[in-house]
Curated annotation (Swiss-Prot):
Modified residues (Phosphoserine): S12, S21, S22, S55
Subcellular localization: Cell membrane
Activation/inhibition comment: Inhibited by N-methyl-D-glucamine. Inhibited by choline. Allosteric regulation of sodium ions binding by pH.
Impact when changing C475S: Significantly decreases alanine transport activity
Source organism of this protein record: Rattus norvegicus (Rat)
Stretch list, region Regulates protein turnover upon amino acid deprivation: 1-96
GO CC annotation terms, alphabetical: axon; brush border; cytoplasm; dendrite; neuronal cell body; plasma membrane; sarcolemma
Glycosylation sites: N254, N258, N272
Consequence of changing N82S: Loss of amino acid transport activity. Loss of amino acid uptake activity. Reduces the amino acid affinity
Protein name: Sodium-coupled neutral amino acid symporter 2
Induction remarks: Up-regulation upon amino acid deprivation results from both increased transcription and protein stabilization. Up-regulated by TGFB1. Up-regulation by insulin and osmotic shock.
Amino acid sequence: MKKTEMGRFNISPDEDSSSYSSNGDFNYSYPTKQAALKSHYVDVDPENQNFLLESNLGKKKYETDFHPGTTSFGMSVFNLSNAIVGSGILGLSYAMANTGIALFIILLTFVSIFSLYSVHLLLKTANEGGSLLYEQLGHKAYGLAGKLAASGSITMQNIGAMSSYLFIVKYELPLVIKALMNIEDTNGLWYLNGDYLVLLVSFVLILPLSLLRNLGYLGYTSGLSLLCMIFFLIVVICKKFQIPCPVEVALMANETVNGTFTQVALAALASNSTAADTCRPRYFIFNSQTVYAVPILTFSFVCHPAVLPIYEELKSRSRRRMMNVSKISFFAMFLMYLLAALFGYLTFYEHVESELLHTYSAIVGTDILLLVVRLAVLVAVTLTVPVVIFPIRSSVTHLLCPTKEFSWFRHSVITVTILAFTNLLVIFVPTIRDIFGFIGASAAAMLIFILPSAFYIKLVKKEPMRSVQKIGALCFLLSGVVVMIGSMGLIVLDWVHDASAGGH
């Protein structure tokens, strides 16, 4: 048995306590958005972590060590919140603008509850299946196909997360440079071109960090990312009371440098009856962009590959205790997402872009507070991308050459290839909305709906197929298939419609 598997379980009838062997080598959680786990095994080589497990490890022989867990309840809540929150928060106002307040709250509630239910399935499957690694559960349940499905979904989700982070660099870094250098005319300036800047940041800053064999700053990155998002939320709430409605007023005020529009004229425009209609919130909206709402929400709630490592580190671990951690974390993120979406929508209404932070620059320009937010978010995402690259590279390494010794050449080639591929996506994919939509409808749906329920049905033997629990898991799996196929189909139709409209 590998160290990445649990040796034995001692589950009480109420499943409130468990004792198992743990992975002494494991020092790194699968980051879905931000890395979630502040592990105290930071000196172990991450390249030796078995992200894509092989049934035969060849030369490597492991002994099973008992590790009781040392992370407090509160820190576990913090770590799981880190794993949940990510760049998806920037797209939630766009989702609300295309669903309406009431429909968005309904969808947000259902997605958060379903995500929490899938955590319940995952924890129970881990107890019964005897493994704390997502891919290994897939291997135990369905062999190589299950392992590849889990690894592929995690890799796709991480590539989507990387792409969204680099999209933020592409959108926001030119605005920061423009504000710091006080540049008015941007025509022909290469250093204000987002495509050039994302390449520059990727290969000058991100690549050297990604080539490291250890990420000692992992825990700091996690904390910084969550703090940046909290700061972002505070600014969104404050700006709601500073930006006039309709936003055309702010646009004219922003574009007028010679005082052409007086305050009286601006007030008259704001009182226009037609403009006032745009400042009335809508509760149910159905349009061609509504289809992106569910994928954006599922993308925003993916944290499941990080749940098991956090569970492993939890002091006095039990499934019930970990579920309490999950409930608090999901409820906190539910409130954070709802507030960010609501105040962003009530600030810009139908003018919300797919990346909320960029909307502020388009409407009101840049002030000191927004500049600080942009700098904080840019630093956070730049430091997080190398963290996300690690599990992708490890999965590729263990898939292509699991028994070979470490090679700097192979390590570097895989890293550069991953980074180059992600940069191509960021340069040629039109908007961050497409990343949120595609990854949310595919990989996120797999990780939240399909895989946990499929693993549960296969590995939890003590419950018959006709039991309420198994029937519920089966219905959950089928709902995930419907969400995936339905969302992907509608998104592709929207892409085709946009392409045909652009061609005319």
